[in-house]
Amino acid sequence: MDSFEDKLQQLREAFKEGRTRSAEFRAAQLQGLSHFLRDNKQQLQEALAQDLHKSAFEAEVSEIAISQAEVDLALRNLRSWMKDEKVSKNLATQLDSAFIRKEPFGLVLIIVPWNYPINLTLVPLVGAIAAGNCVVLKPSEISKATEKILAEVLPRYLDQSCFTVVLGGRQETGQLLEHKFDYIFFTGNAYVGKIVMAAAAKHLTPITLELGGKNPCYVDDNCDPQIVANRVAWFRYFNAGQTCVAPDYILCSQEMQERLVPALQNAITRFYGDNPQTSPNLGRIINQKHFKRLQGLLGCGRVAIGGQSDEGERYIAPTVLVDVQETEPVMQEEIFGPILPLVTVRSLDEAIEFMNRREKPLALYAFSKRSQVIKQVLARTSSGGFCGNDGFMHMTLSSLPFGGVGTSGMGRYHGKFSFDTFSNQRACLLRSPGMEKINDLRYPPYSSRNLRVLLVAMEERCCSCTLL
């Protein structure tokens, strides 16, 4: 028996009845999300600490505040985003109304991962609600404490005839994907992304895939190694390295590596103390499966910093590896943990060639005091996002779209990009029922004179002149 069919049908009926269409309804649901975040802040922080040993600071910065900012932005701009967008016309349509209408797709499925379970639930949900859709949320069963709050508490703040949270693991997700949705938004790894995309293809359902990959970080010789180390260590070991946009490896010269390793040690000690295992600021690996996988990667290359682990606590020390070969496992898969390999190159050209013979990453980073070096890396590579001389700070700007390219994903969201992702851009032209004489130019019998006049009339004009 299909346990989802009845609820999905209820959501479809709610959408058909137009319940989610009005600006007032959308704003009320967004206000509900805002109240959910404010009323349950401590509970959310405790759940994130339980799941990931995430500090209150990291929970606020990367989960709660970002989600709240997205809600606030959508509330401020909702009516302007919803407005029909007027477009330029040609001579033949100067007296007509041409516009793009942003209409909701209908029933949307959002599948959420475990590493940022609040952020990666609420940020796409804001876009789906603002665009006027009904939504099915599927949180990760791996982040159990957060899943419980999303399932039991979040629905109280939303209209449950238009939104629902479903629970379960791989089997339940597979059953859910057998149903036809009007849009699917998935965040996770590429392997599961292919499964989701194949399921969507059966119904020709449009889809956004937010995946991952091995994000490179190039460090030029002219950099201050301590400044680079501070910034790299922060965004590599943030959330215990379980971040899809974290740098997966550093490319630098042998000389820079010799300067960078002690600087990284200084940064790690400054951030997490002499014994990082006792630091309240360092997260833990999500479960035993991922812990075992990461523990296996510690045997690659040579451990220059860290390397300690404790299975009972799912703790892996902030680690730096050197003398790493490109063929080793740590360079063949996304690490998704607090391990940072350093790979030496002889030149910028070699570094760029190294990056370009791999799949396009979700993010790419470059450090240099010379702007032309940053611009070269930007011009000669491709990635979902790029940041020069820092880590994932580009993620803090809702004015920038977030997403991957190639195997790191497809589609964009954040800010208005989320609204656009969950909206059908409907092309509309409203013509006059009269003035039929003008249309004689296009009707048979055809003539060369009529063709010339019609081609001129069909040229796009930016002016507002209404003379024919």
Curated annotation (Swiss-Prot):
Modification comment: Dually lipidated in the C-terminus; prenylation occurs prior to, and is a prerequisite for palmitoylation. It is also required for activity towards long-chain substrates.
Residue positions where N-acetylmethionine is found in the record: 1
UniProt protein name: Aldehyde dehydrogenase family 3 member B1
Expression sites by tissue: Highly expressed in kidney and liver. In brain is expressed at moderate levels in cortex, striatum and hippocampus, and at lower levels in brainstem and cerebellum.
Residues annotated to bind NAD(+): 188-193
GO biological-process terms attached to the record: aldehyde catabolic process; aldehyde metabolic process; cellular response to oxidative stress; ethanol catabolic process; lipid metabolic process; response to oxidative stress
GO cellular component annotations of the record: cytoplasm; cytosol; plasma membrane
Propeptide residues, chain positions: 466-468
Membrane topology: Lipid-anchor
Pathway in which this enzyme or protein is active: Alcohol metabolism; ethanol degradation; acetate from ethanol: step 2/2
SUPFAM superfamilies, per the entry: ALDH-like
EC number(s) from the headed UniProt entry: 1.2.1.28, 1.2.1.5, 1.2.1.7, 1.2.1.48
Top EC category: oxidoreductase
Reactions that this protein is recorded to catalyse: an aldehyde + NAD(+) + H2O = a carboxylate + NADH + 2 H(+); a long-chain fatty aldehyde + NAD(+) + H2O = a long-chain fatty acid + NADH + 2 H(+); a medium-chain fatty aldehyde + NAD(+) + H2O = a medium-chain fatty acid + NADH + 2 H(+); octanal + NAD(+) + H2O = octanoate + NADH + 2 H(+)
Organism: Mus musculus
Keyword tags: Acetylation, Cell membrane, Lipid metabolism, Lipoprotein, Membrane, Methylation, NAD, Oxidoreductase, Palmitate, Prenylation
Entry-linked InterPro entries: Ald_DH/histidinol_DH, Ald_DH_C, Ald_DH_CS_CYS, Ald_DH_CS_GLU, Ald_DH_N, Aldehyde_DH_dom, Aldehyde_DH_NAD(P)
